Amino acid sequence: MAVARHGYRPWGSILGLLGLALAAAAAWDVASLRCTFGSFCECDFWPDLPGLECDLAQHLAGQHLAKALVVKSLKAFVQDPAPSKPLVLSLHGWTGTGKSYVSSLLAQHLFRDGLRSPHVHHFSPIIHFPHPSRTEQYKKELKSWVQGNLTACGRSLFLFDEMDKLPPGLMEVLQPFLGPSWVVYGTNYRKAIFIFISNAGGEQINQVALEAWRSHRDREEISLQEVEPVISRAVMDNPQHGFWRSGIMEEHLLDAVVPFLPLQRHHVRHCVLNELAQLGLEPSEEVVQAVLDSTTYFPEVEQLFSSNGCKTVASRLTFFL
């Protein structure tokens, strides 16, 4: 089976898990000497919340709800020396609105080695769970992987991408790890973080944003109370979603449903300018306009929201530079 991060991991192998646990335990003996002088340092967990807030403010365009929810949830969780349960966030929205970008920022600002940290585990259904006929096998392997890595390091981050494409029933094995029990399978898991990413609810979020625009309401006036119920319904009614009959939503195990609003033309401009800055290039209005004009927008009449958010900005830039 494929691996959960860069390189190859024997995550379906019991011996591999034991080896990982022993290696992590040995590393912890050394790290613990250094971490006794820090408040949060466990494994390579080095939270930089001010840095996260700064990056979100500078680089995440048009997402007032996502910024507020992510920062508030993380602050409360990280500053609690004995959290009652793991932090569980579910990110929802249209393609290219910043869900994957935010998850990468979380890894970058929570762990010293970011996405390269051995305690950050990124799962993709296409890579790790490609065959629905093997769901029972995947369930056993996923349970062993999560349990083994939480035994090695309680401060672990698990990212599950494209929840819409996961085999139905797979996520039910995670339910015991997401609640407030003290110990599961001999493992204390309350300091773990689980992030779920999906497009589910994206169309419904878009409709809320469109209706707000048609009513001449400011985008920032859109509240969580408006979008959270429509996201929940979209997920609960979708048998193709990873949460389908998993008990995760039914048991209210999500700490926050994080909506990502569709991006308008000026938000895409922000992304273009950010990309130019990262490339070390001076902003060119001609190039910016070319990228914006080559982007498709919807609905057909209003031409208000980018069809791909900021997802294709980098590739379009290379064409016009």
UniProtKB/Swiss-Prot annotation:
Keywords: ATP-binding, Endoplasmic reticulum, Glycoprotein, Nucleotide-binding, Signal. The keyword Membrane does not apply. Expressed at similar levels in liver, muscle and brain (at protein level). ATP binds at residues 93-100. Glycans are attached at residue 149. It is found in: Endoplasmic reticulum lumen. GO terms for biological process: chaperone cofactor-dependent protein refolding. Residues 1-26 form the signal peptide. Transmembrane segments: none annotated. Pfam families: TOR1A_C (PF21376), Torsin (PF06309). It comes from the Eukaryota. Changing residue 162 to Q: Localizes in the nuclear envelope. N-glycosylated. GO terms for molecular function: ATP binding; ATP hydrolysis activity; identical protein binding. One of its GO terms (cellular component) is endoplasmic reticulum lumen. Gene3D superfamilies: P-loop containing nucleotide triphosphate hydrolases (3.40.50.300). The keyword Chloroplast does not apply. Belongs to the ClpA/ClpB family. Torsin subfamily. Homohexamer. Interacts with TOR1AIP1. This is Torsin-2A. It comes from Mus musculus. The gene is Tor2a.
